[in-house]
UniProtKB/Swiss-Prot annotation:
Biological function: Redox regulated molecular chaperone. Protects both thermally unfolding and oxidatively damaged proteins from irreversible aggregation. Plays an important role in the bacterial defense system toward oxidative stress.
GO molecular function: protein folding chaperone; unfolded protein binding
Pfam families: HSP33
GO terms under cellular component: cytoplasm
Name of the coding gene: hslO
The protein, known as: 33 kDa chaperonin
PANTHER family named in the record: 33 KDA CHAPERONIN
Length: 316
C-alpha cells in the first residue's frame, strides 16, 4: 500500500483535517540516515508532521521548516516541507538507542528528544521576513508538542497524532499521522465530542497495522459528522541539494576559513545533511571559490568607497 495524504473537512467545514500514511517515506529516510529504531521513530514523526504542514501551504513558493531540540541524546531533529507534499529531514544523532518507555512499552522518543528546549516552526511565505513561531517543549513526544504549538502560537485548537511502528529488522512497519483542527466559529461541544472520540479509538499505527487505509481511519473517527474528503496526494521524501548549493554554502563562510581550506591543499568532502550525498572539492575547486570570494569582497569595498565619496560630495 503506497503512501497517501488526504485533506478533508467535517461538520459543515468547522473541522479541518490533514491525515497521512508515510510508511514508505519514513522507511526511505531511516535507510538514508542509518537510524536506530528510536531515531527512526523521532525522525519519522517529524517528517510525518512536516508532510501535513507542507500541505497547509498556499503556494509552491512557500516552505515550512520544523525544528525540535530538547537537549536529549537525539541532538535535535530538523525537517523542511513543501506544498507539493515533499519533505526532507535529518536527526542530529541517528544512532541514539534507548530502552523502551517503561510506562507504555513504546520507543522512548520523549527521552531521546528531551524537554529542555523548544519546538520552532519557520514559515517562508515569500515575504521579506519569514514567520517564526516557537514554544517550549511540552513532552518531547512531538505530537503533543505540535498540538501545543498550534494552540499557543497560531491560536488554532488542534489534535495531533503521529506514529511510527518499527519492525524487528528495523524497517518501518507503519507510519502516519493526522492533524485535526477546530476552525473559528466551531461549537465548544464539537470540541468535547472530538476529544471523546479520539480518547476512545486505538492508536493510529494500530489501525494502520490492522489493514485500515488512512481514509478508513478518518471515516471511522468522523462517522456521522458529514466528512468530505477534498483532495488526495502522494507524500514523498525528496532532497533538492546540488553542487551549486554546496558551493554557495562554502562561499558563505568567512574568507579566512576558506583560505585555510585552500592552504591545507586537501580534497574536501562535504555531505548533505538531508540525503548524505557527498560532494568532493579539490584544491583547484576551492581556489576558484576563493577567487570568487576575493572578487566579491573587492566589489563590496569598491561600492562602499563610492558611497563614501558620494556622501562627501553631497556635504560640499
Amino acid at each position: 500500500m503506497s503512501d497517501k495524504l488526504i485533506r478533508a473537512i467535517a461538520k459543515d467545514g468547522m473541522i479541518r483535517i490533514f491525515a497521512t500514511e508515510t510508511t514508505e517515506l519514513v522507511n526511505e529516510a531511516s535507510k538514508i540516515h542509518d537510524c536506530t529504531p528510536t531515531a527512526a521513530a523521532a525522525l519519522g514523526r517529524m517528517l510525518t508532521a512536516g508532510t501535513m504542514m507542507g500541505a497547509m501551504l498556499k503556494s509552491d513558493k512557500e516552505v515550512v521548516t520544523l525544528q525540535i531540540n530538547g537537549g536529549g541524546m537525539a541532538k535535535g531533529v530538523t525537517v523542511t516541507a513543501y506544498s507539493d507534499c515533499s519533505v526532507k529531514g535529518y536527526i542530529g544523532n541517528p544512532h541514539v538507542d534507548l530502552p523502551l518507555n517503561t510506562e507504555n512499552g513504546k520507543l522512548n522518543v520523549g527521552e531521546a528528544i528531551g524537554k529542555n528546549g523548544g519546538l520552532t516552526v519557520i514559515k517562508d511565505l515569500g515575504l521579506k521576513d519569514p514567520y517564526v513561531g516557537q514554544v517550549p517543549i511540552y513532552s518531547g513526544e512531538i505530537a503533543e508538542d505540535l498540538a501545543y504549538y498550534f494552540t499557543a502560537s497560531e491560536q488554532i485548537p488542534s489534535a495531533v497524532a503521529l506514529g511510527v511502528l518499527v519492525d524487528r529488522d528495523h524497517s518501518i512497519k507503519k507510519a502516519g499521522g493526522f492533524i485535526i483542527q477546530l476552525l473559528p466559529g466551531a461549537d465548544e461541544l464539537l470540541g468535547d465530542l472530538l476529544t471523546y472520540r479520539l480518547d476512545e479509538i486505538p492508536s493510529l499505527t494500530t489501525m494502520l497495522s490492522e489493514g485500515k487505509t488512512i481514509e478508513e481511519v478518518i471515516e471511522f473517527i468522523f462517522d456521522g459528522m458529514d466528512l468530505k474528503i477534498l483532495e488526495e496526494e502522494t507524500p514523498k521524501y525528496k532532497c533538492d541539494c546540488s553542487r551549486e548549493k554546496v558551493e554557495r554554502a562554502l562561499l558563505s563562510i568567512g574568507y579566512k576559513d576558506l583560505k585555510e581550506l585552500y592552504d591545507e591543499g586537501k580534497e574536501e568532502e562535504l555531505k548533505c545533511h538531508f540525503c548524505n550525498k557527498a560532494y568532493k572539492f579539490t584544491k583547484e575547486d576551492i581556489g576558484k571559490l576563493l577567487e570568487e570570494k576575493e572578487k566579491s569582497i573587492a566589489d563590496e569595498v569598491s561600492e562602499e568607497m563610492k558611497k563614501a565619496e558620494e556622501k562627501e560630495k553631497n556635504k560640499k
